[in-house]
Amino acid sequence: MKQTTIAKKVTSVGIGLHKGEPIRLTIEPSSENTGIIFYRSDLGISFKAEPKNVVNTQMATVIGNQKGYISTVEHILSAINGYGIDNIRINVDANEIPVMDGSSISFCMMLDEAGIKNLDASKKAIIIKREVEVKEGEKFVRVSPSKSPKFDYTIKFSNPIIGTQQFAFEFSRKNYVDEIARARTFGFLKDVQMLRSMNLALGGSLENAVVIDDNKILNPDGLRYENEFVRHKILDAIGDLSLLGAPILGDYTAYAASHDLNHKLTLAILTDAKNYEMVSIDEQIAHEYAKIFA
């Protein structure tokens, strides 16, 4: 199985969640073994999508260095991971990825327009060899060996609109588009009002998030899935784990987790070489993990 990139450059413009200003986003083909590269065209600096370049995980995943950063990378990374794309360059002219509609479906549409191109080098994957878990109180994230990789996530909120939700998702590109990609980010009206008082979330609206006010959803069209909230958490996790640089061949399980716990999990996996094996995907591995590469 070969590494992939996109076949052509595609550009879109969307609103930044925090500043509320238009952001120009361009995805471009990239050569084999380069991975996912973010480029700040306004600053002329770039960052590779990898755990060591994560600089903040409060409310979003932020990558960068001393010269600059890009916030809210998890949704576009989720789409790229969902589509199994190994090498791509992402250009933005601001310090955040546009929020689009709050899900990853707009990025999926950009990838569909760009098309997927095979490269010469062999595709790589990370086989999870033993269980790795990160816990903080009752919250946890965990990966474990599995021949049919899935994401199993449980959330628990005191708000009755969300409550306790659990969803298990068997990873494949088709399942990603059908079951995960349209799930939007969500928040509470009181939190949005607080953030705006801090000059943040200026681009947030009912057009790009599910907003909850006490016991009701403010969006006129309601939810896209009955359990859209937990599905979006899986969307985020798929994006956060893509920072490992290759698809994970193993199960991911989470309870009340966060971007921060996901980041700590990626670091924990890489800390000990006994936790995983980086492999080139030959016919045997492709057959063993047939569902993920369907």
From Swiss-Prot:
Q: Where is the active site?
A: 259
**Record's catalysed reaction(s):** a UDP-3-O-[(3R)-3-hydroxyacyl]-N-acetyl-alpha-D-glucosamine + H2O = a UDP-3-O-[(3R)-3-hydroxyacyl]-alpha-D-glucosamine + acetate
The Swiss-Prot or TrEMBL record annotates one GO molecular function as: metal ion binding
The pathway entry for this protein reads as: Glycolipid biosynthesis; lipid IV(A) biosynthesis; lipid IV(A) from (3R)-3-hydroxytetradecanoyl-[acyl-carrier-protein] and UDP-N-acetyl-alpha-D-glucosamine: step 2/6
Question: What cellular-component terms does GO give this entry?
Answer: membrane
EC id: 3.5.1.108
Q: Which GO terms fall under biological process for this protein?
A: lipid A biosynthetic process
Uppermost EC category: hydrolase
Positions binding Zn(2+) in this chain are: 75, 232, 236
Kindly state which keywords UniProt assigns to this record, in alphabetical order.
Hydrolase, Lipid A biosynthesis, Lipid biosynthesis, Lipid metabolism, Metal-binding, Zinc
Q: Record's InterPro entries?
A: Ribosomal_Su5_D2-typ_SF (IPR020568), UDP-acyl_GlcNac_deAcase (IPR004463), UDP-acyl_GlcNac_deAcase_C (IPR011334), UDP-acyl_N-AcGlcN_deAcase_N (IPR015870)
Required co-factor(s) are: Zn(2+)
**SUPFAM superfamilies assigned:** Ribosomal protein S5 domain 2-like
* NCBIfam families for the chain: lpxC
Q: Which family does it belong to?
A: Belongs to the LpxC family.
The function of this protein is: Catalyzes the hydrolysis of UDP-3-O-myristoyl-N-acetylglucosamine to form UDP-3-O-myristoylglucosamine and acetate, the committed step in lipid A biosynthesis.
Q: What is the protein's name according to its record? A: UDP-3-O-acyl-N-acetylglucosamine deacetylase
Task: Give the species.
Answer: Campylobacter hominis (strain ATCC BAA-381 / DSM 21671 / CCUG 45161 / LMG 19568 / NCTC 13146 / CH001A)
Gene name per UniProt: lpxC
